[in-house]
Amino acid sequence: MKVLFFSNKFPVEEHADLFQRIRQQSRSSRHAVLRQLLDECTAAVREEIRLLPAEIRTRLPPFQSILDLAEGFRWERSPLAGTFECVFLCLAELCLFVGDYEARPQAFKFTRSDSVFTGLGLGFLAATAIVASPTLIDVPATAADVIRIAMRAGLVVYHQGQNLEPQSLSAPLQSWTTLVKRLGEEAVQRELDCFNSAIPRPSQIYISVVEPDGSVFINGPPSIMRLLFSTPGPLQSAPRAPLPVYGGPCHAAHLYDRSHVSWIVKHVRSEIAWREFSDAAPLLSMADGQPLRAQTALELFESAAYVLLTGIIRWGNVLAALEEREDGAIQIESCGHSTPVEKLMRVLHAPTRDLTEWLSDEIEAVPGTHADCRIAVVGMSCRLPGADDLEHFWELLEQGRDVHQHVPPDRYDVQSHTDPTGRRMNTSQTPFGCFIDSPGLFDAGFFDMSPREAGQTDPTHRLALLTAYEALQQSGYIPDRTLSTIRETVATIYGQCSDDYREANAGQEIDMYFIPGNYRAFAPGRISYFFKFSGPSFSCDTACSASLAAVQIACATLSRGEANMVVAGGLNILTSSDSFAGLSRAHFLSKTGGCKVFDDGADGYCRADGVGSLVLKRLADAQRDNDNILGVILAAATNHSSAAVSITHPHAPTQEELYRNVLRQAGVSPLDVDLVEMHGTGTQAGDAAEIESVTRVFSPSRRSERLYIGSVKANLGHGEAAAGVTALIKALLIFQHNAIPKHVGIKTALNSRFPDLGQLNVHIPGETVPWSPRPNRKRYVMVNNFSAAGGNTALLLEEPPQRPTPGPACAQTRFVVTVSAKNPLSLRRNLERLMAFLRQHQPPVHLGSLAYTTTARRIHYPHRIAVQGASIADIIKHLELRLADLSLAHPQGAVARPPPIAFVFSGQGSFYPGISHDLLEHYPPYAREIHQLDALCLRHGFPSILPALTSSENSPSPLVTQLTTVCVQIALTHLWKSLAITPAVVIGASLGEYAALHATGALSASDTIFLVGQRGLLMQDLCTANTHTMLAVQATANEIAGCVPDSLSYEVACINSHRSITIAGTRSNITAIKASLESRGYRATELNVPYAFHSSHMDPILEKFNAIAQQATARALKVPLISPLLVDVLHEHTTLPASYLAEATRGRVRFSEALEKAHQATLITDQTVFVEIGIHPTYSNAVRSTVHNIAAVVPTLRSDQDNWHTLAGSMAALYEAAAGLDWNAWFEPFEPELRLLDLPRYAWNLKNHWIQHNGDWLLWKDKDRDRDNGKCMTHPDDGRGLYTPLLHRIVEETFWAGGGRVVMESNVHQEEFFAVASGHKMCGRPVVSVFSYPDMALSLARFVYTKVHPDISPPAMDFGNVHIFEGLIPHKDRSSPQWVRLQIKTTSVKHQLQVSFHRVGEDRVDQLATGTVSVGNAASWLSEWSGIAHLVSSRIKALQDLVHEGRADRLTRDTVYHLFRNSIVDYSPAYRGIQSAVIDGLEAVADVVLASSNMDRWTAPPHHVDSIAHVCGFVLNAGNAADHDNINTVYVMEGWRSMRFAKPLVSGRLYRSYVRMVPARDTGFFSGDVYVLDVAEDEVTGLLAGVTLRPLPRILMHRFFDPADDAHNWGNSPAKPEAKPEMVPTSGSSSAAGSPSGSSAGPLSIPERLADPSETSFQSKASKVSKALALIASETGIDMQDLNDETCLAQIGVDSLLSLVLVEKFALELGVHFPGSFFLDFPTVGEVKRQML
C-alpha cells in the first residue's frame, strides 16, 4: 500500500532555489505535464490577482510565470505572506509530485485498496488535486483550481485577521501562532479559558494544533498573544516559540463557517467540480484521521477547505488511523523528509520515497518549437493619405478612391526636382505620390514637448505618439489596471526605413533636438518614455516590410513572455526628393500616377506616407481584461528570397513556402482562407510573382469557396515602412464592417501574365462584397508584405471571437459618465464629440458600458467633467448643460492634484428599513463585507443585522439599529477605500465615532462591534427606553435658552454648527420645548431615538461600559482624528485611553468647534473634500456652515434615494475634485456584463510644427549649378561667400571690431533677378517690386553679422525706416548689364545697420531707397503681439460678419488680381498669394497661401512678402472706399517704419493679412499696419508697421513706369517730398496715422503702433526676471503670456538637455550663474522667479 503524504512545510529552506530547479527541469523533454501545470497555475493566479484590491495588487511585481513570483518576489515579507505561502507550498508539492511521476514512469493509479492520501495544513489541500485527478494528464487543470482555492483560503484568513487586528500593508509582520511545549492540551486549555473570560470571543486565543508529544500550537491576534504571555501563570513560564505564521487565524471553528468555504471554492470549473469518485483513494483528515466524505471533486474541495479553516490538527489521530489500516508492504511517498514523515516511518515501519530526487536529473532540453500563442489586436489608429482616422480610411476604401497626387509644396518644389527625362542630376522622373495632409500637426503640450522640440522632431515620431495614444485609448488602456497592462511589461516596436525629415528638413539648421528628434530608435523610445513603458523598445528596418516584420516581432515577444502588451506599427513620411530620385531611376516608381495593382499596364508603384499603430496582447489576456478584440493573429513568419535573380526581385517559390509555413503554424487549411491582402505594388515583376505564389497555395485547382484578393496600395500607394501595418488595419476594418471593399488598381485590363483566375475561383472585387460572420466557419485573411531588400513577411488573421451583446443594463440603475482633457479646448471638443456620438448612436448605446468605458477604461486628465444619469437621454441632457457652462467666460478649471479627503461619520440619526439594500443585493464586495461583519456580530453573541438591512424587520431593537448603523459605516468605509478614496483625516459624531475610530486603525472591526454591542446591551438593561429623547433645533444655543422657560430642563447634547444644536431631555420636556421653539419660528425636529445620548440619561451605563472598554485592544491612530469630545486634533501614533469611549457616550458632541480647530491647524483646507459616511447625510450641512469655501461635501447613502443614485452623484463630485477614484475596482463585479465602447478619439489641440525644406540643394549637393542647364558654374562673387538671386557680386568689403561696410552690385538683367521683376508688371513693363529690397537688405545684413560674429547665429532682424525714392525698372534692351548697388554699413552690428540702394549708370548714381536693419528677438516680438492678437482677430471677425450680413464683399483670388491688373499692377502666379479677400472701405483682410519657393536661396522671398503685404495697395487702388480717389489716382509705396517676421514665411501655409489704412499727415498719403496671422498657429507672426503709400496721378503712370531706358522713375514727381531723408534714420515716424475713425463694421480698436525697435530694446527695458522669462519663452517656443507661476517647465519641454542650454544662456546673457540641475530642482516658473529674486 502507498501512503502519500503532503507536508505543511517546504522540503528545502531556500524556496527560491527549489523553484529555480523546478523551472530548469520544466524545460526538459520529459516534463510536458509539468510545463502544462505551471502554465495552468500561472493563468489561475493571474485571474485571482486581477480580483485583488488595487492597494494590494499594485504591490506585486509583474510576472510571466508563477515561478517568477515564487522566485523573485519576497512574498515571505509581504502583507499577504500567508496567502502566498498557501499558493507556493501547494504549487511546490504538486510540481514535485508531477515531476516525479513523469521522471520515474509508474502507474498513476490510486484506489481505495492500494493507496491512501493524507497531509498537514496546506499540504492537505494540495493532496486534493491528486485525489481528484483520474490521470496524470488531468492534474494540471485540477491543480490550477486547487491553487485558486489555496489563494482564496489565504485571503479569507487574511481578511479575518484584518477584522480582528488590522495591520497596515507596510507594517512589520507579526506572528499569529506560538508553539507551547510540556504543558499538554488540557493544561493549556484551562489557562486559555481563564484568560479568555475577559477577551471578546472572536479575539480569544485558541488551540490550533495538538502534537503527538503533547506540544500545542496556540493562535490569536498578536497583541492578545503578547498580553497572554505577559500575564503571570503557567503559560508565561512554559517553553514557547513564536512561529512564522503571519496570515491570520486558521483552524478556528469559532471564526469560520460554510459561507467562507462556499466563496473559496466558488470558481472551480464545472468539468472538474462534478467528477465523481467511485474507487478513489481516501484522503485522511488531519483533524480526526477519518477519510473525507465526498462523492465529487467539489465536495472533496469543500471538505478539505472546511477542515483547513476550522479543524484542529491532531497528527496523532492520523497516525493511529494509518496504523489500523496497515496491510502488507507499505511505501511512503513524500516531498522531502520532515518530522511527520519520520513519525510515519516509525509507526508504519515503512521506507520513504522522496519525490524531490528527480530535481537532480540531467536535463534533456525541449527542441525549439513555435509557441502556440494567439495574439489579439485590441487597438489601432492611423494617419494615411486621404484619411486621418479609421472612419475616413474605411470611407476611402468603400468609395474606391485613388488618392495619388503631385508632390505638395510642403514637401519640396516638385517642378524643380522632377525631370521626366532623367537628364537633370538628382531629379525624380515622377511627380506623383500619396500624402498625408498637414503631417506637421501635433499637440506638443499634451506630450510635454516645447514647440521648439516639436518642430525639430521627425513628424513620423510625433504621429507615432498620436496614433499610439489613440490605439491605446481604443484598447481601453489604463496603466497597471491588469497584469497585462503593467507598464514594466509593455513593449514598443515600430518599423521604419527612411530618415527624410532628418536629412531634408531638420538638417537644414541643426538644433539641440536634432539627434533625439530624428534618429529612428527614438520613435519607439519616445513612446515608451512618454507612457513609462519599461519593456523592450525596437526600431525595425526591413525596408518595405518593416511594419509587418515589427508586428511579427511583437507577436514573438508576446509568445515568449518578454512582454504582456506591445504597441507596434510602421512610420513613413516623405519629405526628401532623394528617395524619389533613387527609386524612380531604379524603375521602381510609376511615371503615370498611382499603384495600378493587377493592371496589365502596371508600371511601378506610387510612394506614400503612412503611420499606423496597433496594440497587441495575448488573446487570453485580452479576453481576461474585457478588451475589444479586433482580430486574432494566429501565426506570422518571415523568410528571405535568397534564390531570386537579384536582391530586389521577388521570388514566388520563397513566398509560397512562407504562406505554407504560416498556415502550418496556425493549423489552418489554405482552402479555409477567404481573402488574401496582397503586397501588390503594381510592378510587373512583383504582381506576377505574388499571384503565382498565392494561387499555388490557396487555389492550386478550382476551390469550392471563393478566394478574394486585393491590395490597399491601389488606393493609398505604397507606404513602404508603413505598408504592412496599413494592409493589416484594412483587414481588421474588413472584419469590423463585414465587407470586402472593391479593388481600384485595374485601370485598363487585368494583367495578362496572370493565370485564369475565374477558373480557379479567385476573384478581384469590382464592387464592395458583403462578408458577414458564419456560424460554422471562421473567416481568415492572409496579409502579405515583401521587401525590396528580399524579405517576405506574412501573417494569418482570424476574425475576432463573437461575444454576446450585454443586456439592457446591469444591476446599477444610475451611472457616471466622465470627460477629461489636458487643456480647456480639448475638453470642449471631447465633450462635443461624445455628444455627437451619443446622438448618432443613442438607441444602441449601452449606458453601463458607456460609463465603464469613460471611467474605468480611460486615462483621466486635470480638465474634467462628470455627469450622471439613468438613461442615455439623461446623459446627453446633462452633457449639453455642461457644454453650455464651458463658455469662454467660465472655462472649466483644472485641478492640479488629488485633494485631501475627510471622512465624516454621522450618528444613529434617522434609521430606516432597507439601508444599503441595492448595494447589499447587487454589489458583491459590499455584501461580502456586510456578511463578514454580521458573522462577527453573531460570534460576539449579538443578534444578526441582516433582517434590519433586508427590510424584513420593521422595528428593530435599539441594539440592532446601533449595530447595523456601525456595521454599515464600516462596510462603506471599506467600500470607499477599495475605490482608492482614503481619508487624510477622520471625524465622527456620536455613534459615528466608533466607525471613525475603526477608520483610523484605533479599533479593529471586531472590537468596534464588541463595544457598540456591549454599550447597546447596557442601555437596554440600565436605561429605560423612550422616557427621554433628543431634539434637533435650527438655532443658536443662546436663542434656544431664550425660548425655553426655566421650568423646562434640558441638556445641550450636540453642537453640530453655530445654528444647529441638538438638545436632550425627558420626552415631556422636549415636547414642550419643541412647541415653544416652533411658536417663535424656529425649526425643531424630534429625533427617532429611544435614548437621550450625550446626556445624564447615559449615566447608569458609564461605569460598566468603561470596564468593558478595557477589554478592547487600544491601538495607535494611523490617521489623524478630529475629536468632538476633546475639541482637538489627535495625530497619528496617538493612543486613546480606554475611558475615552465612556466619556464620549456622556460628553457633549462639539462637532463644529472641533472642525474649526482642525481648520485653524490647516488639517482641513479649502481643498478638502468631505465624504459623509452614514445611513443619511445628517452632518453635511454642518460641515458647509462651519468650514466655508470647501471643495465638496458628498454623501454615501440617502434615505430618499436608491444607493446607485446617491453614489453616482458623490462619485461624480469626487471625480471633478480630482480624487483618484479607482473606477476599475467599482466596475469589477459588473465587468462581465459590460463592453468597452469604441468612442470618439481624443480631440487634440493641434498646431503645425514643420521645418520647411527650402531650395534645391538636394539636387546639386556639393556642386554649384546653373539652373538653366544643370552645368556647374562659378559664382560672380569670386568665392567671397554670398550669392543669391538678387545679390551677385561684392565690390567692396571692409570689417572692423563690431562693425563693417559692404557694397554689392547686382545685375537686374540676370535671369533670376529679371524673373523677379517680370512677375510684377506695371503699364506692361517689369518693375522690381519694392519688396525685393527686404530680401537684399536682410541677406546682406546676415552676411555682415556672420562675418563680424562668426560663432553666433544671426538673430531675428527688423528691416525698417524704409523710404522709397525711385522705382527700379529693367531696361528693354537686356543685351548689357543693368546694375543696382546695395551698401550696408554699421558701427555695431548688434544694434543697427544702415542700408541704401542705388541705380548705377555709366555716368551717374541715383539713390533708390534707404533703410535700416535692426537686431531683434523673435520670441519677444511674438510675446508683444500676443497681447494684441485678440484685437486683430476681433476686427477680422467683424469683417467676416459683414459679409454674412451683405454689407461687405468677399472677393475671390481671380477677382482680386483682375482688379489689381486693371488698376495698377499685373502680378504673375508666383505673386498671387491672396486666395480671397474681404474689403470694407479702407479696411480689409486677405487669406494668403504662399507659392512654393527654394527657401534656402532667399531670406525674404519678394513674391512672399509682396503677397502678404499688397493687401494695403489693393485697399487703395482697387477698393471701394469713398474717402480717396482711385479713379484718377494710383497709390505707390512710399516706405514703412518696421518690417518684422518672427517666423519664416512658409510655402503652402495659410496666412491672414489684416490692414486698415488711414490718412497720413502728408496730404493724400495713407498709412496703416499690416498684421500677418499664421492661421494654423492662431498667432500674429509678422507685422509691417507704418506702411505708407503716396498718391500719383494715374495719367502719369506711363511716364514713370514705361520710360525710356535712360529715364528716371517718378524722380520728378510733383508729389515727391522736396528733401530726401538722410541715411541715419530718425526715431519717429513721418507717416503715423491719425486717430481711428468709425466704421460700419463697428468701432475700430486697433492698438497703438509699436514703438521703434530701438525704443523697445529688450535689454534696456526688462528686469532680469523678465529677461529670464523671455529667454525661457524663446528657447521653448512658448508665448510669454503662457508663462505663469504655475507653469511646469517640464510640461513646456524643459528637459535635462534644454535645462543645460538655459543655464548657459542665463550666464552669458544675464550674468546669472546656476548649477546644471537648476531647472530640475526648481521645476515651475514661480520657483525660478523666487530663486532669482
Curated annotation (Swiss-Prot):
Residues 1299-1594 are annotated as: Product template (PT) domain. CDD domains: PKS. Non-reducing polyketide synthase; part of the gene cluster that mediates the biosynthesis of the bicoumarin desertorin. The non-reducing polyketide synthase desS first catalyzes the formation of the pentaketidic 4,7-dihydroxy-5-methylcoumarin from acetyl coenzyme A and 4 malonyl coenzyme A molecules. Further O-methylation by desB leads to the formation of 7-demethylsiderin. Then, an oxidative phenol coupling catalyzed by the cytochrome P450 monooxygenase desC forms the 6,8'-dimer M-desertorin A via dimerization the monomeric precursor, 7-demethylsiderin. The gene is desS. InterPro entries: Ac_transferase_dom_sf, ACP-like_sf, Acyl_transferase_dom, Acyl_Trfase/lysoPLipase, Ketoacyl_synth_C, Ketoacyl_synth_N, Malonyl_transacylase_ACP-bd, PKS_Beta-ketoAc_synthase_dom. This is Desertorin synthase. Pfam families: Acyl_transf_1 (PF00698), CurL-like_PKS_C (PF22621), ketoacyl-synt (PF00109), Ketoacyl-synt_C (PF02801), PP-binding (PF00550), SAT (PF16073). Residues 406-422 have a biased composition (Basic and acidic residues). Residues 372-799 form the Ketosynthase family 3 (KS3) domain. Residues 21-358 are annotated as: N-terminal acylcarrier protein transacylase domain (SAT). GO terms for biological process: fatty acid biosynthetic process; secondary metabolite biosynthetic process. It comes from Aspergillus desertorum. Gene3D superfamilies: 3.30.70.3290, 3.40.47.10, ACP-like, Malonyl-Coenzyme A Acyl Carrier Protein, domain 2, Polyketide synthase dehydratase.
